Amino acid sequence: SEENKGMNFMSNFWFSTETEKKTSYFQLIFHIDNVKYRYGFEINENEVYNEWLYVTRHRETPVFIREGQNVNVTRSHMETGYDIANMKSKLFNEKVLFLSVADSFSDKLASRIVGEIKQFSKVNSKISLEEKKTTFLKDKLLKDKIIKLLKYADVGIEDIDQIVLGDEKIDATSSFLIGVHRKYDKNLNEIGTSVTLFDSMESEGTKEMLGISLPIITALELGTPIVIDEFGAKLHPLLTRKILSLFNSKENTRSQLIVATHTTELMDPRLLRRDQIDFVEKDKYGRSYLYTLVEIKGIRSEKYEQDYLEGKYGAVPFLGNWDNLCDIINDIENEED
């Protein structure tokens, strides 16, 4: 249903009897107009147990605190929210976040915070490419920016367009992205252009770069955060460093890039500070722990990548004896025979 669709993403940790029924805890700490906010909630698949919003100007004070269906609101911070809380379950139930209800009734602070949270986007390059292709193809200025970024990335693309194919029998059309490349004769003289179907003819790296180009440009222009999973998996290491440098430059004061990556070359003190490098370590019970490099005591070396691969920071896989793997496979095949 519409009211609890936001809980559909919930999935408990199923590898432990202690956590399979336990609530999950989420919290965001962020700034709006140089004012610090802390918003969070505890939920399971069916119910909101706790929810809170704090603001810090001179000191941290509560905007609202929710326990079950009981909500205490500071009226001076959230006037419409205060009225909603007094009406209790007539306007919201245990499956709905109080902040979203206050937003739907146009509470000024709630709407501002929800608007900021909605700017926080997780980038799936393939989905982004399909969903946004009409947007950037119709916007010449935006398209020019994307083409410029692709040229800087040295992927060989001169232009991007689309072809539209119609089917009169079913009254439908399909559109396909195409890439425009320079074409040369045997003497390497430019003689025109050649086109490629993006989905089937371009490399995975080129498709990845196009897919993340629009979110990157949007984030840098609007000062919003983005999250990219498996960052660098399909891109050249020099290119991933350049992208990271864009967000880590002095010119960028608002936007934030958060990535999950196995590209250890990015663990470079010339590129990232220790407090900007986090690790996720999974133990033998399947539990994952997040910690930052700055929390690890006694680090004097700046060879972050080398030290990490040597296991000095943890968060490396426990690999078996691969030297004997071929023998083990052969033994299994012999047993099958």
Per-region residue spans from a language model:
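Phosphate-binding glycine-rich loops of NTP-binding sites
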Residues: 1-13, 209-215, 245-246, 260
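Post-Walker A helix-loop "phosphate-sensing" segment adjacent to the P-loop in P-loop NTPases
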Residues: 1-7, 220-221, 250-253
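Conserved P-loop NTP-binding catalytic core
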Residues: 1-38, 44-48
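Hydrophobic "anchor" residues on beta-strands that sit immediately upstream
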Residues: 36, 225-226
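Electropositive, glycine-dotted interaction segments
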Residues: 36-167
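Conserved ABC ATPase signature
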Residues: 169-217, 221, 225, 231-235
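Short alpha-helix of the ABC ATPase nucleotide-binding domain corresponding to the H-loop/switch region
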Residues: 236-241
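C-terminal lobe/lid and adjacent interdomain/linker elements of RecA-like ASCE P-loop ATPase modules
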Residues: 242-337
